[in-house]
Each structure stands twice: as C-alpha cells, then as structure tokens.
Amino acid sequence: MSRFPPFTRQFSPLSLLQIYSGVAGLYDFGPAGCSVKENFLAVWKRHFVLQEGMLQMECTTLTPASVLKVSGHVDKFADLMVKDTKTGECFRADKLLEDTIDQLLTGEGSETLLSAERTRLMQVRAQADAFTPAQLHEQLTQLKVVSPTSGAELTEPFPFNLMFATSIGPAGNMPGFLRPETAQGMFVNFKRLLEYNNGRVPFAACQIGTAYRNEIAPKNGLLRVREFTMAEIEHFVHPQEKEHTAFASVAGLELQLFPARNQLSDGKLVHMSVGDAVVGGVIANETLAYFVARTALFLVSVGIRPEGLRFRQHLANEMAHYACDCWDAEILMASGWVECVGHADRAAYDLAVHSAASKTDLVVSRPLPTPLEVPVVVMGGNKGLMGKHFKGANKAVQAALAAACDAGAPAMALQASLDATGEAALAIEGGATVTLTKDMVSFEAGTKKIHEEVFQPSVIEPSFGVGRILEGIFQHTFYIRPDPEAEAAAAAAAAAAGAGDKKKKKGAKKDASTDIDRAVFAFPPVLAPTKVAVFVLDSRVPPTVVQPIVAELTRLGVTSIVDNATASIGKRYSRCDELGIPFGVTVDFQTESSGQVTLRERDSTAQVYLKLAQAPRIIRDLAEETITWAQVFAEHEVKNTGAPVHPLAIRPQPKWVQAPPAPAASAAGTAEPAVPVATAAPPSPAGGTAVPKEPVTVEGAGRTSGHFTRPANPIA
C-alpha cells in the first residue's frame, strides 16, 4: 500500500557489520528502535504474562541435536529451494512462485486475464507454501518461471534445512543447533513447570528470546531475517476440555477472518464475532479462539489498525499432521499481508514424542470425582521361558505384549489364537514376527477401579514474531503532517506566471525535504521510545528550573530528553515528532516566576498550561495511558487548540458486536462476570456476508464466565 512508507532515518535498523558491507538477514537496532522494542515487550508481558498468570522461562539457545531430532526439526524444518543454473544463486521456491503470480495479477497485461484464470492463479498463490516439491515444480514450469536476476532456468525444488548447525564442546562430538523456535525448551521442562503449578492444568508457560533460521533469501527488512526475537506461549490444557473460563470476555469481539474454505473459493474475508466463530465451527475451540481474540486486542493496543489486521486459517495441507487448527495473525504492510503471529492447536504431539524418546512421563494426573471401573487385560506367563527362547529379542517382545495389553483387543485376539491352535504370531519392533505358545503367556479380561485420571495435555501455542510486528507498527503509525501554509505557498509559486523550469525543480526539491521534516510516528504513549521532550526556549532559563523537572520525571520512571538547541521551536517539535515522542514540555524565562509550563501533544499539536509541580505526574499518567489527553485538555487552561488530527494518528478501536460482560457483585461481595448474549447473526459459509440465523446464546450455569452453545442450525 502506498501510504506505508519505508523506515525513516530514526528507526531504520542497521545492517549488521555495516562498516564491513553488512550481512543479509542480520540487523542491529539503534537507540530509538531498541527503546520501542523494549517498550513493546513490556506491554506484551503486561497483556499476557501478568493478566493470564503465565510462568515465564528463559531457556538456552544452543540445543542438542537429539532434542530437535525428536521434535522433527532435523528432518522436516525446511523450505523448498531452487537454484539459478547459470550463477548458482538460490531462491525460495514458493516465494518466487508468489512473486510471479503477483506480477501476472497486477502487472502489465493483467487486465487481459480471464476471470477463471485469475481465480486459478489466486488459489495457486494461496497454496504456494504448502506444495510438495513435485507440485511446486509443476507450477513453476507451467508459468515459465526463470531466475529473476539472470533469466536462466531454475533447478527443480529441493528441501533446504533452515537450522544453523554447530558442535557443543571442544571435542566436537556433540552436534547441536541454534534453536529455530523457543517452544522446545518449554516442552522438555514441562514436568518442572507442572510441579511449579502444583500439578494442575490448565496453565501457560511463556518465553521471550532469540531464534535463528538460515533463510534462503532474506529480504524486506525485518520481515525475513536470520536472527530474530520471538515471544511464545504454550498453554497446556486437557485434550477434551478446551473451553476457557474467560472466553465470554472476548466472545463479542468482531474480527476479520480468512477461513480455509474462502481461500479456496471466493477469497473474501469474513467479519464475525469470536463467539460465533466457535459456535459455527470456524475456529476449533474456545481456548484457541480466546488467544486469537487476545492477540487482536494486543496488536490494536500497540498501534496496528484493525482494518489492516486479519486472521488467516491454515489450509489442510499447510498444517502438521498432528495439528487440529491453526490461525495466523497477518498485518497489511507495503509488501502485502504478512504473517506475524501464529496460533496453533498442537494437540499432545510435542509432549508425546519427548516423553517416548526420554522415557519420562510428561503427563498430568488428577483425582476423579467418582472412581471408575474400567476393563483391563491381565497378562500371565513364564517370563523366564520367554527370555531363554527369544534371547536378544525378548525386550522387544515384552514391549509388544505390554502394548497389546494396554490396547486390550489385540491381547484378547492373541489369546483366542492360543486357545484355537496353541500358538499366536506377535509383531515386534523392527518389522519382525515371533511365535508365542500357551506355556509362555496367557491373557485374561478383567476390570479394575481407578481413582485418578492420567493424560497428556494438549498445547495451544500463540507465537509472536517481534520484528515483524514492529515493522507493522512502524508502517501503521507513520504519517506526514499536512502543512497548509507550505502547500498554499507551493501552489502560488507553481501558478506564478513566468516561473522557469529550474525554479520549479528547486521548489519540488524543497517540498520533498519539507515532507521529511514533517514526518510523524503516532506511537501509542506506552510504546514511544521517549515519553516527553523538555524544550528550553530561552538561554536565560537557569539549570535550576529544568533539572528538577527532569529529575522528577526520572524518579517517576518517565523517559525524557532535554532540547536546548538554537533551532526554531517548530523544527525542534518536528524532530521529536519524527521520533514519535508524544508530549513536549516548554520551559521559558517566565517559568521560574509564574510556576507554569506548557504541555504539547504530538498529534493534535494542542497545548495547555500546567503548574510546574503537577506536570511530571500528569505526564507520567499520560505516558502510562491511565488518563487521556482529552481529559488533560478539558481540565487545564488552553494555550492553543492545535490542528485537526491526521486520520492515521487517531487511535483505532476494536469493534465489538457486544460489549464484554461487566462484573456484578455477588452475595459474598466478590465480582462475578455477567452472562452475555451474542445476538449477531453468523456469516454465510463462503460469501462473507451476514445472513439471518438463530441467535447464538451464552450459558453461564456453574461456570465462571459461561460458554457458547451451538444453535439449532449451526453453520455447516
């Protein structure tokens, strides 16, 4: 989108080792960018870790190869790559296909495309990163894709593992990798986390840290890099109990959803409430939908505009075989829709594979309210005889017999064969088959009473790519402040008779420079790198006036800068606007005697008078967003009303189909959430438009926040 500019000079990330020509995909943050990132992570922790009571961890970035072999990363963590047959240059195959299709859909000659062909290309693009090597080769060949740099032919796509390999220790005999995600550290520490949480689920663990991926073709600034910060959450929950106690608080939030069925049909977004998405089976369960909604609220709170945010469901061939449902939060940027946050229901896969490989029970046990009698198969036999007969294979035989008993039916089938013929064939690990006899083993059906349930929890995982979200924030909060006087002067100069070409070119250059000088980042105050600038307007102002203001701001935790430059106050304001500093305090020669300063707000440029003693605390409250500028403006003497606020500077608000439930006082005096009722009609399955349906209701009996029930005629 043209309204999203590239980074300005203040926030451009620096290429790593820039004085040595840089390295693709590696970046350093400067002072302003680093401050925004730290503030972003602080808001993230407050929004998720604090509010949800999560257990935060910090795990090592060096990971033994055995861990990532078990998780599947060694074998499957790869992108498909093609090479230029002439130069050997490497390209990511799916992105090359996407770029080619984008050019066909929007470039020269695109208007001649038939509707059916346009639809086909859009569907191919939607599936590009889910194709097998053979399917991708077929599409690249069909579209006659060649190397974008040399025009030469490309090799067939082949997998390229994205992990950085290393060795741990001086002997070099322990292979390892730089972690490609932070999640595995939390999975292998699950047992300790469960103990810390007193053995109870649901609970969530989280981690903020660096991950590494050896990207084939890094590009687009922070969007595709080789080292990046992730903030990941692993929410552990009973596999059959994926309701969420706080779901009603977000059920009325309306989101832009892009379900898989729409991606393969009309390509339309669906506007619907989170509650209706669960009721209609669009999102698999309440817990997954809850985190999707919480992510939407978080992204909007840090400056992402709701109209530039959508949630796209993974196609069936994109998801891992163990995943139940996956939704990506995508932010609209200059390069298109960019995946920034993944939400996946990973089932119990990770804990299951690590449990099996480590021979450690990564399970949860909890007492049953009423003991249950369950059918069991009891095995008897002569283990000594089996040991002598099977020798080295006996361990595998015993494991296969135990598995048959656990399953029940296979063991009774073995007994039936023993009763009928005196022998039974047993398949063991490795594909071999052994013969059992009646004097070796027997099986008997029975029952036993169990008093506790043992289960492997499912995992709901929201995973945040911090750098990508920051780039989205930079693009969504940037605007050029209109300057009516400069525009009028430029128009008058252009209209002046006799203006020469040289004069016009000079004027155009000046206008471009003016645009840069009036660049503004409309960061929310909590995200701004510096909260307030203290402008000293007169060289006669003694330090004894300025220093106490700065000292009190520092004591209150408010970051500030002092600007006593000799440039005009307008230029000094512009410099701070470009840094996204939301507030400015002006101190003049009369401040000492009057006890007053003026406070300027960045986006409206309005100013009010404040008492010197009150200013630091008011600025602190504004920076923490516990009060608003509108309140301050209404309660204090106005110096000037400023200018109309630019549309891109107006803080966007999420849309609610119905407001979240308000707390109601119970008989015991504690707050209990009210029971909400969602009355918005669910959307049609594919068209994305609302159609009359039976209203969705909320039941709250016996639950903290209630849960949604399916209507009589749920969405197919």
Where are these regions (language model features)?
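NTP/phosphate- and nucleic-acid-binding module
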Residues: 1-716
